[in-house]
Amino acid sequence: MSIAAVILAAGRGKRAGSLPKKPKQYRLLGQEPVICHTVRCFCQNPAITTIILVIHPEDRQICEQAIADFKEQLIIVEGGNTRQKSTLRGLQALRKFKPKYVHIHDGARPFVENKLLEQIHTTVTPQEGVLPVLAVCDTLKRINSTHHVLETIPRTHLYSAQTPQCFPFERILAAHEKAIKTCKKEFTDDSAIAEWFGISMRTIPGSPHNIKITWHEDLNTAHLYLQKKMQMFPDIRTGNGYDVHSFEEGNSLILCGIKIPFHKKLNGHSDADVALHALTDALLATRGAGDIGTHFPPSDPQWQNVSSEIFLRHALDIVKQAGGRIANVDITLIAEEPKIGPYRHAMVGNLMNMLTILPDRISIKATTNEKLGFIGRGEGIAAFATANVLYPGEIPK
């Protein structure tokens, strides 16, 4: 069964009080922009084969920065000046992929759960779309222009609609094209267009956590829920890494991505950054994803002399795609020389940028080997690294 998704992120977020050039979908939620949380669940679901992300034309740069970890899995399409036009452009971009079904989802709903997607997948049919809903619990009042109550509306059989909403692809595409052609603009969601077009919609229970960030207060609520979610499922994983490289003739070496003037350099297939190699292994260990040699074998000439930041960013991609949040990292460098102290601040700053964590979560220490062994003889540098990463999900029993 071929399933695609259109994620709508072209809005300007005026109701959420967006900062200049910072719509709500690009605001930070925890350590990542809202849109990263939104796309992750779709990217991790194996049944979803194609994902279209519809953005505002002015947001391409900020979007590409925000979704860098998922760029290989997303197709970016520029939207129109209304939600309806943006949705149509996303659907039209899917036409060449010919999916059987398509999810349409609000980019400002960051807490889609995989179990909801799975329930949708087992419910949707060529004849019926699927709509997650929640029963209305509050008492509803109709008021007039002077803010006086006109009547109380019975809430029996009233439900609020959520996304993702899933449809037979060809039928919802035809519905949107007809709506634009006939200038029908009064729809507030895609299920309304489906109803108008004659597509039957089956409802399933939504999730109270699947909130849409519309107002500024919603972002505060999302922060609280994210914190609670991570506390409820404290899957804290610790990974360790070790690496060592010998010296050879040279005039500088690289540690934590920082060039250090020295009368020798480190010998290695890449730039021989022993610190980043150890840290890469530590991060990979938190996912049981092998080691640096598994992903970047030294026998492969394409990795010769490349920056070790490439290796670290690859490990970070693996961590982030699993929803991991780095709690802290600790690196110990063991060498008789050069002196590390003068470069420690620059090293921490470089790791801050790569790991997107605060400096108090980065420890870089250096020690000698008291003149013992090959390190004591000044023949090379060794590094130990430890990474603690918090992942969502319960610890297996």
Swiss-Prot record:
**Pfam families, sorted:** IspD (PF01128), YgbB (PF02542)
Which SUPFAM superfamilies does this UniProt record tie to the protein?
Answer: IpsF-like, Nucleotide-diphospho-sugar transferases
Q: Which reaction does it catalyse?
A: 2-C-methyl-D-erythritol 4-phosphate + CTP + H(+) = 4-CDP-2-C-methyl-D-erythritol + diphosphate; 4-CDP-2-C-methyl-D-erythritol 2-phosphate = 2-C-methyl-D-erythritol 2,4-cyclic diphosphate + CMP
- Please give the start and end residues of each transmembrane region: none
Segment 2-C-methyl-D-erythritol 4-phosphate cytidylyltransferase: which positions?
1-236
Cofactor (UniProt): a divalent metal cation
Functional summary from the UniProt entry: Bifunctional enzyme that catalyzes the formation of 4-diphosphocytidyl-2-C-methyl-D-erythritol from CTP and 2-C-methyl-D-erythritol 4-phosphate (MEP) (IspD), and catalyzes the conversion of 4-diphosphocytidyl-2-C-methyl-D-erythritol 2-phosphate (CDP-ME2P) to 2-C-methyl-D-erythritol 2,4-cyclodiphosphate (ME-CPP) with a corresponding release of cytidine 5-monophosphate (CMP) (IspF).
According to UniProt, the name of this protein is: Bifunctional enzyme IspD/IspF
Name the source organism. Answer: Bartonella henselae (strain ATCC 49882 / DSM 28221 / CCUG 30454 / Houston 1) (Rochalimaea henselae)
Lineage, uppermost ranks: Bacteria, Pseudomonadati, Pseudomonadota, Alphaproteobacteria, Hyphomicrobiales
Gene name of the record: ispDF
